[in-house]
Each structure stands twice: as structure tokens, then as C-alpha cells.
Amino acid sequence: MGSTMEPPGGAYLHLGAVTSPVGTARMLQLAFGCTTFSLVAHRGGFGGVQGTFCMAAWGFCFAFSVLVVACEFTRLHSCLRLSWGNFTAAFAMLATLLCATAAVIYPLYFTRLECPPEPAGCMVRNFRLAASVFAGLLFLAYAAEVALTRARPGQVASYMATVSGLLKIVQAFVACIIFGALVHESRYGRYVATQWCVAVYSLCFMATVAVVVLSVMGHTGGLGCPFDRLVVVYTFLAVLLYLSAAVIWPVFCFDPKYGEPGRPSDCPRGSCPWDSQLVVAIFTYVNLLLYIVDLAYSQRIRFVPTL
């Protein structure tokens, strides 16, 4: 009789991918994501830019969660030319932010306690309430994965699992919010100073994305200089650049000499330049704070690029 050979790396299927605490969180992500998407698509309904964003966010997160679980369960991630630990940590943080945003937007724009006037209004309301609940649970499931996989003090970990790595995802996400406000009637082209602020946002965003991509692709070791040192230098420069934007943008948007100190009474809701300028100012300070915290943590991290 012939004999069977054991696979050299152990069992072909990795049961821990679905039974470990992280695996359990990922299975909950799949369950909650599918439920939320189905409730909205079946009867809850959506519309406009806000609803499209929510559906796109849930669909994106569900698709990539399926990919992560499948690759972990079948061990196929070892065949991919990327740093799997960095990829999963970065995706979990991005999914947490996307699902948190969708969990706020969908109830805010589509959920009401009273029944709509149409014949099936109460059923639609119930589906939307249920979708809002599961959207919140989906956010918690992704946040749980981030908490479980985050690098602890003294632990050997990939860069994206460290506080500094996770903050890179948040910084890029906040920059996208700033860009969204800039293109929405912000009038940033009126002054050279505000154009400088846009250049700051763009430069820091591209550099942050480059750090994330290099980490996920596992190419941080071939830069000719220690990657952690480059990250610290870049983060310090980003703090200085954002500090300049945090001073310049409010002056040229809200000082009476250049802009409006208060919201004009005749400014139309939904297309008011002052509102967009305020959003940019708020999230400029948010990102400045994130870069300062990042700089503080970057001084102490030690990571393994190939994990």
C-alpha cells in the first residue's frame, strides 16, 4: 500500500485562523458585515453620496475580510509577496475607521424612530434600525482585532502593528477628510498661503501612504538607511509642516482681513465655503495632534520589517 506524506509545514489548513481570539473577531466581522450589507440592500435602503459611501465601505471591508480569513485558513498568505503582518494590521485599522464612519453616517441620515408615511414604512424603519445596530457591532469587531493584534511593550512585532504604524493609517484617513472638504467649495485657491496649506496636506499624505506601502510590501530593508530612523525624521518634518498649516489656514480663512470670522447668514446649507473651511481647520489640528503623538511613540519602537 502507498503511504501519505505530511506537508512539510504542518497541516494544510490552519484552524487557529478561525478559533483563536483574532480569528473569532474576524469571523464576527464576516457575520456582522454580511448582515449589515444585506439588511440595507434588502429593505433598509440607501441613497445619495452618504448611503453610497456606507455601502462601499461595508462591501470593501467584507471583501478584504474574506480574503484575509481565506488566506490565513489555507496558509496561502505565505505565497504572497508582501508582509502579511503589516498588511493585516493596516487593513484592520483602515476597516475600523471606515466602519466607524459608516456606523455614524447611516443612522444619522437614514434612521428615524418614527415610521415613514409609505405603506411599508415601519418595516423599512425596523430594517434600518437593525442595520444601524449591526453596523455598530461591525465597528466593534474590527476595533477588537486592532486591540488584539496591537504590539505590546517589549513584543517583537511588525511596524504596522505598533502605535506609530496604526497612527499612519489614521493620519491618511484624516487627510482624506481634509481633501474632501477642500474640493467642496473651500476656496483654497484665493491666497498663496492657503495653497501652501494644501501642499502641506498633499505632501504629508503621500509620504504617509509611501510609509504604509513600503511596510506592507516588505521593502523597508532596502532603503539604504534604517527605516525607523527615516520614519522619525519624516514625522518630525510633518509636525513642523502641519504646525505651519495650523497657523496659516485659520488666519487666511477666519481673520476679518482675509475671510469671515463667523458663518455668513446667507450661506446655503450643504454648499457653504465657510463650513468647508471650518472642517479643514478642525482636522488640521486633529492631524497635527496625531503626528505629535506619532513622533513621541516613534522614539521608542523596535519592529521587525519581515513579519
UniProtKB/Swiss-Prot annotation:
Please give the PROSITE patterns that the UniProt record associates with this protein.
MARVEL
Domain MARVEL positions: 17-154, 159-303
Where does this polypeptide localize? Membrane
Note the superkingdom of the native organism: Eukaryota
Spell out where the chain crosses the membrane: 53-73, 90-110, 129-149, 163-183, 198-218, 232-252, 278-298
> What name does UniProt use for this protein?
Myeloid-associated differentiation marker-like protein 2
Q: Family membership, please give it.
A: Belongs to the MAL family.
Q: Which organism is it from?
A: Rattus norvegicus (Rat)
Q: Which PANTHER family does the annotation name?
A: MYELOID-ASSOCIATED DIFFERENTIATION MARKER MYADM FAMILY MEMBER (PTHR17068), MYELOID-ASSOCIATED DIFFERENTIATION MARKER-LIKE PROTEIN 2 (PTHR17068:SF5)
Keyword entries, A-Z? Membrane, Repeat, Transmembrane, Transmembrane helix
User: What is one term from the GO cellular component aspect held by the record?
Assistant: membrane
Q: How does it sit in the membrane?
A: Multi-pass membrane protein
